[in-house]
């Protein structure tokens, strides 16, 4: 990572801010359920440690930032809708990656609701990095003008883990939007699907320099297939489903999304084009046997997305 903040952006005016946590897959979605008050306390603790620092900013330790487990380097331009969601770290004096996202419209990004600290968050605390396979490339950052968190969101494990970020006008030419999957289109385990991101490459090992976007092919599974192992692991005996109807499961032996991939895309090749079918949400560890990653099922939220955004490309 470079030793200076990403160019083209100044730190937001209002302080303090929540810390650049890396919400992602965890043994249960407890991390995603942290209250805004607790996030604020965590941020104050981190900020106070660096409040006396002066001079040139130092690199953000990669363990604090964020990869795909079992993946490999993504070719430039293959996933042109992939973006990185950033918040400003006053401790490290740079914009730090917290989550992934997908460009679904030239001015709209779809991500996970748990990547947003609280529903009425000031959009100026976020930036979007787009159009580059390298997490800390030299491209400038895009400003966020509006945030819409799904009104039913409480925590990732309860569903509705989806949010929209509207971007200020920009002139990036090397990005492309991804199509949403039609509501009527059914997914099968035979569909060719890929997950991408800059998160951890194994559970306790972050993506190393030069922080190249990772990709991994995964298989979409029926919800009932992953419901039982999650139920067994949690000791849940009630009637409520753990893998809800607005979620889907995907994974393959040794390949999975992980910490720092949250909010990023799960795309499948459907009807001759790539379609966004899932948003990285939660899971039990990373690549643990019988525990595929859990994603927000984008098809369920297409009507809501269109209601907010209007016509898509």
Curated annotation (Swiss-Prot):
SUPFAM superfamilies in the record: Trypsin-like serine proteases
Annotated Gene Ontology cellular component terms: extracellular space
Main localization category: secreted
Gene Ontology molecular-function annotations: serine-type endopeptidase activity
Disulfide linkage: 99-115, 193-268, 226-249, 258-286
Keyword Cytoplasm: no
Subcellular location as annotated: Secreted
Transmembrane region(s): none
Swiss-Prot/TrEMBL keywords: Disulfide bond, Glycoprotein, Hydrolase, Protease, Secreted, Serine protease, Signal
Enzyme class: hydrolase
Highest taxon of source: Eukaryota
UniProt xrefs under InterPro entries: Peptidase_S1_PA, Peptidase_S1_PA_chymotrypsin, Peptidase_S1A, Trypsin_dom, TRYPSIN_HIS, TRYPSIN_SER
Enzyme Commission (EC) number: 3.4.21.-
Glycosylation sites recorded in the entry for this protein: 143
Pfam families: Trypsin (PF00089)
Keyword Glycoprotein among UniProt keywords: yes
Domain Peptidase S1: 68-310
Positions of the catalytic residues: 114, 161, 262
Similarity-based family: Belongs to the peptidase S1 family.
This protein's name: Putative serine protease 29
Originating organism: Homo sapiens
């Amino acid at each position: 990572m470079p030793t200076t903040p990403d160019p083209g952006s100044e730190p937001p005016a209002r302080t303090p801010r929540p810390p650049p946590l890396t919400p992602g897959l965890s043994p249960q979605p407890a991390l995603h359920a942290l209250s805004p008050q607790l996030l604020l306390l965590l941020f104050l603790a981190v900020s106070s440690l660096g409040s006396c620092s002066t001079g040139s900013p130092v690199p953000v330790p990669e363990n604090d930032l964020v990869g795909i487990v079992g993946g490999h380097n993504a070719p430039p331009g293959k996933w042109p809708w992939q973006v990185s969601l950033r918040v400003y770290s006053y401790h490290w004096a740079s914009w730090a990656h917290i989550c992934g996202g997908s460009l679904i419209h030239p001015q709209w990004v779809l991500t996970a609701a748990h990547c947003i600290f609280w529903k009425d968050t000031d959009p100026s605390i976020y930036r979007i990095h787009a159009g580059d396979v390298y997490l800390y490339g030299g491209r400038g950052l895009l400003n966020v003008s509006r945030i819409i968190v799904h009104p039913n969101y409480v925590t990732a494990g309860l569903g509705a883990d989806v949010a929209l970020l509207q971007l200020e006008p920009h002139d990036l030419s090397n990005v492309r939007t991804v199509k949403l999957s039609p509501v009527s289109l059914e997914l099968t385990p035979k569909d060719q699907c890929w997950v991408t991101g800059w998160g951890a490459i194994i559970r306790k090992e972050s993506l190393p320099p030069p922080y190249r976007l990772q990709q991994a092919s995964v298989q979409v599974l029926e919800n009932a297939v992953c419901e039982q192992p999650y139920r067994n692991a949690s000791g849940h005996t009630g009637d409520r489903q753990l893998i809800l109807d607005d979620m889907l499961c995907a994974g393959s032996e040794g390949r999975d999304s992980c910490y720092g991939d949250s909010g990023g895309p799960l795309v499948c090749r459907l009807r001759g084009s790539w379609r966004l079918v899932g948003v990285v949400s939660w899971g039990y560890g990373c690549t643990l046997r019988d525990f595929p990653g859990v994603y927000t099922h984008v098809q369920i939220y297409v009507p809501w997305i269109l209601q907010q955004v209007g016509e898509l490309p």
